[in-house]
Amino acid sequence: MFGAAGRQPIGAPAAGNSWHFSRTMEELVHDLVSALEESSEQARGGFAETGDHSRSISCPLKRQARKRRGRKRRSYNVHHPWETGHCLSEGSDSSLEEPSKDYRENHNNNKKDHSDSDDQMLVAKRRPSSNLNNNVRGKRPLWHESDFAVDNVGNRTLRRRRKVKRMAVDLPQDISNKRTMTQPPEGCRDQDMDSDRAYQYQEFTKNKVKKRKLKIIRQGPKIQDEGVVLESEETNQTNKDKMECEEQKVSDELMSESDSSSLSSTDAGLFTNDEGRQGDDEQSDWFYEKESGGACGITGVVPWWEKEDPTELDKNVPDPVFESILTGSFPLMSHPSRRGFQARLSRLHGMSSKNIKKSGGTPTSMVPIPGPVGNKRMVHFSPDSHHHDHWFSPGARTEHDQHQLLRDNRAERGHKKNCSVRTASRQTSMHLGSLCTGDIKRRRKAAPLPGPTTAGFVGENAQPILENNIGNRMLQNMGWTPGSGLGRDGKGISEPIQAMQRPKGLGLGFPLPKSTSATTTPNAGKSA
């Protein structure tokens, strides 16, 4: 564009006005481009006459913005709503602008013109389709009355219908409640549009997609010809009416309009407000709030905690397995086993009641146990199943000494070869098995067990086998000589296999002598 300054146009000064000439050339090129755009728009249907009123009102705004912000290159760039027609200079009186004015006047003879000045005509003509109604975006339109809309229903073109679809008529009611703002009355709308341009642009950016789906929800006189939402009611509705209107909306539309801080796409049906939408795994387990109560948001499903009758929970229905545990009546148990189980169960119940009362002297029970000689012996044991609990009670040591004294006295009065504390059944060993190991050793010294008391070999002190013994004679008949080893060559064993005998009741863990083997085999050379 600055290359055009080198050329000498007809009627222009050669020096001193180069800057003014380049500026004028820019404006001329810009006017030609806008005129071409206007002709293409008229070929597709042109502007409707309804927008001229809003254009004439917004012209002072555009003139002020043009003075303040300087010139711009093209009018169809993305600007603020008040920056659309700022490219022309009002003080330009050069002769180069006259052809452009003649061209514009000849071009607009077939249109209805409401403005007298060239600036207003240029601003109205150069307004692109994307910025047609930016000044009223976020506010209610100036031509929203129902009689005006009814007059223009029939003669709307396709181009006009596309523009009206994009218009945001009003704030959503839930957002207006959030911001605690009320809509201005009808008389103040023009004044607000002149004085509050910054807020108007903010509302334009935030409410681009807010009313895209309102033609589906609102019924009756509020819809005039496709997507145009024209409200005949006043804005002084109560909060109750607003809540009733919001309950009619679909849940995804509620979520898409609830957050006003994120911008969405302006394509039809495309909502990208992800902050208020839900994922597939969290689909609306809150929307059903009736009296019966839904399970996980599914209507009509009554949960189990509401389905059960509370009277059924109070009934003591006997559990057969639990009853069989209590009574000992298992199907696989024999009759004596059941009786023994019931006897032990009743005895344990009696012991628990006695443990609560803890008297000074604990009663003893005498159980007949068959002894090794054939006589019956009365065995003394403590009936307390939790005998080890006495070690942790305050009088544990004195009570244990009394039990030890009773056992020792009974052992001295009885047979010395019998044990006074021998246990023959599983439940009595349970009572005595809780004593410590040192107590068991002291008790065995006081009341020796039947059988050998010390470890030794079987037949250690036995007499040698006589030669007239039957076994000895059999071996001699087979070729064995006394004093030699067994076998054909006499290299076998010469002494009988030694069997280790341990004290009674100590079990397999008793330490054996290191020099001998612990295997217990029948003694071949022991005398009968």
From Swiss-Prot:
Gene Ontology CC entries for this record: nuclear speck; nucleolus; nucleus
Sorted UniProt keywords: Nucleus, Phosphoprotein
Expression sites (tissue/organ): Testis.
A single GO molecular function term of this UniProt record: nucleic acid binding
Cellular localisation: Nucleus speckle; Nucleus, Nucleolus
Bias (Polar residues) ranges: 514-528
Annotated function: Enhances the ATPase activity of DHX15 in vitro.
Protein's name according to its UniProt entry: G patch domain-containing protein 2
Biological source species: Homo sapiens (Human)
Name of the coding gene: GPATCH2
